[in-house]
Regions:
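ANL superfamily adenylate-forming
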Residues: 55, 129-130, 139-186, 200
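Conserved AMP-binding loop of ANL adenylate-forming enzymes
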Residues: 90, 222-244
Length: 244
């Protein structure tokens, strides 16, 4: 029997479209972004500028390596015993450390807040830290040994060292898709502090939805593809996660 050519029907087109959407859904949360990046481009790299090096050298990690690293950090964070949604003030100087801490907080169910360099004036520094504590109703800080020295004289802070968190994370080897909880698009994702030029700093809340909307709009406007290279600058009120 000769083969019969059939024109695609509406149902056929619908099924084809449905299959495509199931195979490659649009990310709805930042958790999805990381998972999709690892699944589709495992060998693509993130480059981190090392500010402490004299030549500002760039260290790289593949998406797969970074994914495993931050998920292990996130699992180690749970050992702190903090409730879901707790705000963690991230006070670090190195590019990679900041990004790893932010992603680990997200995956652990915490809300990261990047803290810019504190004032060298003790009175200003103490006032700002006290304000942040009152603003968030907590005082969880993730920092380095140098950062801890700057704020160790301020009472009532729950300080955690990144070096100790890294050591704790070495005990874990979680699954490549491990998360402490499933995020929703309108969950708080990250907090940004304003400069405080008109008084004490205010916290700007960004949800998973708002960050992804900004990323999609910028990506379309600039014509970005999976081969694009992005220099991720970090102004105090910009989206640190935008193209990480």
């Amino acid at each position: 029997m000769a083969p019969i050519a059939l024109a695609p029907t509406t149902n056929t087109r619908f099924v084809t479209k449905l299959k495509t959407s199931i195979v490659s859904p649009q990310p709805n949360t930042l958790h999805d972004v990381l998972a999709h990046a690892v699944e589709r481009y495992p060998l693509h790299e993130l480059g981190f500028i090392t500010s402490s090096a004299h030549d500002s050298s760039i260290q790289t990690k593949t998406f797969s390596e970074f994914n495993q690293y931050v998920r292990n950090l996130a699992r180690a964070m749970l050992e702190w015993g903090k409730p879901k949604g707790s705000v963690v003030v991230v006070y670090l100087t190195e590019h990679e450390d900041n990004m790893a801490a932010v992603w680990a907080c997200l995956l652990a169910g915490y809300v990261p807040c990047l803290q810019p360099a504190l004032s060298a004036q003790q009175a200003h520094k103490e006032a700002h830290v006290a304000h942040i504590k009152n603003l968030f109703g907590s005082a969880i800080w993730l920092t380095s040994e140098i950062g801890a020295e700057q704020i160790s004289s301020i009472s009532g802070l729950d300080l955690h060292l990144l070096s100790e968190l890294k050591a704790s994370a070495e005990k874990f080897n979680v699954a490549a898709n491990w998360v402490a909880y499933e995020a929703k698009p309108d969950d708080e994702a990250i907090l940004f502090l304003t400069s405080g030029s008109t008084g004490f700093s205010k916290a700007v809340v960004h949800t998973h939805r708002t960050i992804l909307a900004a990323c999609r709009a910028k990506g379309q406007s600039y014509g970005l593809t999976s081969e694009s290279r992005i220099l991720n600058c970090k102004p105090h009120v910009d989206l640190t996660l935008a193209f990480n």
